[in-house]
């Protein structure tokens, strides 16, 4: 099953992700999108928004299996991010489509994930410049941009997690 993750999302970003999921699902009918909101107290609001888009959601329960029909897996617990980065090749980092300044991309990069982000990344500008230069992160502003990049990444047979980790560790040794 194709899996990708949206982490540290903020209000309005989950709806954006839901719409992207719907469009990607026309090509990848078994796609699973994992959403880890920045503020888990919003989980039921997010779930309702996604259901209004016609998406099937599943709230995170560690020992409960999800169905093949699940579109969006909603994580409502802190400290789970690394588990989902480990199984996702591609991660969108929230707080970047809104005027928040973005989220730290180093954890996702350390797990070898391709990173998608919006234009508002001023809190971590220098790190994103490096990641963009290495083709580890990709800036998106609109659904069409995210669809184009995710489609390319999801259709790739190459698993470049090791390559990404090596680039990060190599840069870390130089610092």
Predicted features by range, described:
Residues 1-175:
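Nucleotide-activated sugar donor-binding and catalytic core shared by glycosyltransferases
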């Amino acid at each position: 099953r194709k899996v990708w993750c949206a982490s540290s999302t903020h209000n309005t970003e989950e709806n954006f992700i839901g719409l992207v999921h719907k469009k990607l699902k026309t090509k990848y009918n078994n796609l699973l999108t994992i959403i880890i909101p920045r503020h888990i107290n919003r989980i039921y609001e997010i779930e309702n928004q996604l259901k209004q888009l016609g998406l099937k959601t599943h709230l995170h329960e560690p020992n409960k299996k999800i169905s093949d029909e699940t579109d969006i897996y909603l994580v409502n617990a802190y400290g789970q991010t690394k588990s989902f980065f480990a199984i996702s090749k591609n991660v969108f980092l929230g707080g970047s489509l809104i005027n928040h300044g973005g989220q730290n991309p180093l954890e996702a990069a350390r797990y070898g994930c391709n990173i998608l982000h919006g234009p508002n990344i001023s809190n971590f500008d220098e790190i994103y410049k490096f990641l963009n230069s290495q083709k580890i992160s990709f800036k998106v502003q609109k659904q069409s941009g995210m669809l184009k990049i995710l489609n390319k990444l999801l259709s790739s047979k190459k698993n470049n997690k090791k390559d990404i980790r090596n680039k990060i560790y190599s840069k870390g040794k130089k610092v």
